[in-house]
C-alpha cells in the first residue's frame, strides 16, 4: 500500500466498539497505592466475580477491598440504603480500621439512580471516617478512567492552601495550554521575575498513580533541577494529601487523567502545566524541561542524560528499528507509546484510542507531530472510538509487524496470522522515567521474536476437516 506523507496529524472518529476491562479494575492498583484505604465496590454479582477473578486476589487473602452486592429490593428502592451502608462501613472500620473508605459506584448504581453522593456525607459525619464516592463504572470508554474518576474525587478532599502574603496569584506560564483552557487566568508579566527571584519554587503537585519505586524517579529528576515537589495525588497515606489552591502548580504523569486535571483547575483553582508525559527518555526530558520553563529555570544536563539512555538501548533498538505497529485502542496511553516507538525507528500506521481529550494531551500531540518530522516518517492516523471491523480490514491491507490490542481480540487476531501484544500490559508495567524505557522495548521485542514460533503451529490456515476423517 502506498502511504502518502502527511504534514499534520489526521483525526478521525468512528462508531466505536468497546471490548475493554471494566473501570472498577482500578481498585487492583489503587488499594495498594493508598495503603490506609478500603475500597467498597457497590454492584452486582458480575462485579464481584470480576473483582475476585480478574484482579487475581482470593477472598481469604483479606485484601483491602470488598463487594457490596445489590439485591432485588435495591432496584425499586424498597430497602434502606443508608442503614445497609452504615452496617457495612461499621464492619469495615471494626475489621480493618482504614483512614478512608472509597465507594466505587458501578453501572447498576447509575441505572437505578442510587444516591451514593447523598448517603456518604451523612454517614461520614456519623461514623467519623471520610467516605469518598467515585463513579468508576463500565459506562466509560476505557478501564483507565476508573483511576481518573477516583483521583478527581480525591482532589476535593485535599486541604486548602492558604494564600501567600499579599494575596497575589501566580498565573501559569504555559501559553500553549492557555489556548485550550480559556477559563485559565491571563498571564502576568511579573510572575517569571517573581519565580526566578525566589529561592524556592512555587508549590508543585504531581498527580497519577505510580509504584513507589517509579514515583521516586521523576521526583529525584526534578530535584536535580532544584525543583521541590510538594506532594503527589494519590499519596500512600490519606492524611498526607497535599494542599491545593490558586498558587499551586500541578502536572500529570499519565495521559488518561483529564477529569482529574479539570477538577484541579476548575474546582481547586490550581495552575496546570501542560507537558508531554514522562514515558520514554524523550518524553521524560520534555516533561522535565516544560516544568523547568514554567518556573523560569534552565534545565541542566538533560540532553546528555537522554543520550546516555538511548546509547544503552542500542541493542534493543536494533531489533525494533524498521518494524511497523498498529494500535487498535484500549487505553489512552497509545499517543505517548506511539511517539516513543517512532523515536525508536518504528513506523506507526494507525493510533486507535478509545477517547481523547485534545486539550489535556495537547503537548503530547504536538510532541508526536515534531517527532514524526524529525524522524522523517508519515504522520500516523489517529482514530477515536475505532470500529474493530474497519480496523481489521486496514490491518489486512497494511500488514503491520505488531498490533497492540485489548485482551478480547488478541487470540482471534493471532489465529488469523496477526502478531499481537496486550495493551493492558503497558498499564501495569513500569514505563515511566529514563531508566524504564527498556521495559517498553522488552514488551515489544518478545512478541516479535515469538512470531515465527506461532507460524509453525499453522495458525494462519483455518483447516476444515471432514467428519469421515475421524472414523
UniProtKB/Swiss-Prot annotation:
Name the pathway: Porphyrin-containing compound metabolism; chlorophyll biosynthesis (light-independent)
Could you tell me the Gene Ontology terms of the biological process aspect for this record?
Answer: light-independent chlorophyll biosynthetic process; photosynthesis, dark reaction
EC category: oxidoreductase
| Matching InterPro entries | LIPOR_BchN/ChlN, Nase/OxRdtase_comp1, Protochl_reductN
Positions contributing to [4Fe-4S] cluster binding = 22, 47, 107
Pfam families this protein is in? Answer: Oxidored_nitro (PF00148)
- Here the disulfide bonds are none
Q: Which cofactor does it need?
A: [4Fe-4S] cluster
**Which reactions appear under catalytic activity for this entry?**
chlorophyllide a + oxidized 2[4Fe-4S]-[ferredoxin] + 2 ADP + 2 phosphate = protochlorophyllide a + reduced 2[4Fe-4S]-[ferredoxin] + 2 ATP + 2 H2O
Q: Where does this protein chiefly localize?
A: plastid
Q: Sum up the protein's function in the record's words.
A: Component of the dark-operative protochlorophyllide reductase (DPOR) that uses Mg-ATP and reduced ferredoxin to reduce ring D of protochlorophyllide (Pchlide) to form chlorophyllide a (Chlide). This reaction is light-independent. The NB-protein (ChlN-ChlB) is the catalytic component of the complex.
Similarity field: Belongs to the BchN/ChlN family.
Q: Which HAMAP family match?
A: ChlN_BchN
Protein name (record): Light-independent protochlorophyllide reductase subunit N
Q: Which organism was this protein described from? A: Huperzia lucidula (Shining clubmoss)
Q: Which gene encodes it?
A: chlN
